[in-house]
Amino acid sequence: MDPLWLLLLLPLAVASGWYASRREMPKRAGDEEFNLPSAYFKGLNFLLNEQPDKAIEVFIKVLEVDSETVEMHLTLGNLFRRRGELERATRIHQNIIARPNLSNSQHLQALFELAQDYFKAGLLDRAESLFLELADAPSHAEQALRYLSQLYEQEKEWEKAIAATRRLQKYSEKNISPVLGQYHCELADICLDRQEYDKARAHVDNALKVDPNSTRATIQLGNIEFRIGEYQRAIDTWRKIEEMDPRYLGEVIDNIVVAYRELEDDEGLREFLTNALDDYGGPKLLKAQVEEIQHRQGRDEAVDFLTDWVRKNPTLHGLRSLVNLKNMELNSTTPESELEPLQTLLVSMFDTDGMYRCRQCGFTGRTLHWQCPGCKGWYMQAPVTDEHLVKQTN
């Protein structure tokens, strides 16, 4: 038998015995004799013989649902839910709610437990209905609103998520404005996909109102300016990322290059790339700088620049970029480069270009998710760096 189950069930068994003995105890003063129901001993026997399911069924029968046993029944229902037996948990909680003699607090707690049963079972419509009812009860409002936010996130009903989270702000001591900003950003993304730029801008403005330092909203605002041809405003907007979180500058570097070229501002582009690479580094900024040099001055100059840069900044992504570029140079003159095995080795061992890692749960992938697929945390993923690799290989 699972030791955890034994620890959880023993208190229930003790409580059952106490309650049963209390109900069977003679009412005459001084009469010390009492008899426990045989069902109680039967339940203990099932428990000791590692048959917890049968034991639980017996204890349910022993414990009549009234004002004195509600807490024990709620505990029993929770045990079922933790174990994944949602039908049994639901049945117990529905049975409690059906009793006419519950106090208001007991009724609300039973509703909350039943709502959690539905939520875990994926019966989201039923869960939503109960959580909405509980959100109007001061004793359960905060917990119910948190579940509603999760539910609406899961269903991608962002308007409802915003409404629930705004209500939650009244109860929560934690700053949840960044999460509220992310919901507005989700709506902005939908409008961007539909090319509804005015609506997208309105959602981005709302995101920045609740979270002025939102990197995601700043990226989106730059994207709007870029798509409508306001290239200088796009550049100015994206460059604010340098002050917010420069790790994400690589997410917009390609469009920044295009914007400078559309403005025919080659000098501005060279200055920006040089300063950004010196200040922040990173594989995407290095790649953009090398490609720009190769575009303006040719491959030889790009190789010379990259060789010098790797010498001064010995990083894995720099070495990999240099080997790739040298291999391209050799392949242009010979059928097969002697650097190909090294290139293959570096890629197989340290292929982190375009990879992101969640700082909360460690989830890793090649797509930037503003909400981590693993832990569901918002704004937890960031580009993988050489420092991550060194720690991993050590």
PLM segments and residue spans:
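Long, contiguous interaction/recruitment modules in multidomain scaffold/adaptor proteins
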Residues: 1-34, 129-146, 150, 154-173, ...
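Alpha-helical segment of the N-proximal tetratricopeptide repeat
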Residues: 32-68, 75, 81-85, 91, ...
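Start-of-helix register in tetratricopeptide repeats
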Residues: 37, 71, 105-109, 143, ...
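Structural register within alpha-helical repeat arrays
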Residues: 42, 76, 114, 148, ...
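Residue at a conserved register position within TPR or TPR-like alpha-solenoid repeats
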Residues: 46, 80, 118, 152, ...
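Short coil turns that delineate tetratricopeptide repeat
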Residues: 67, 101, 105, 139, ...
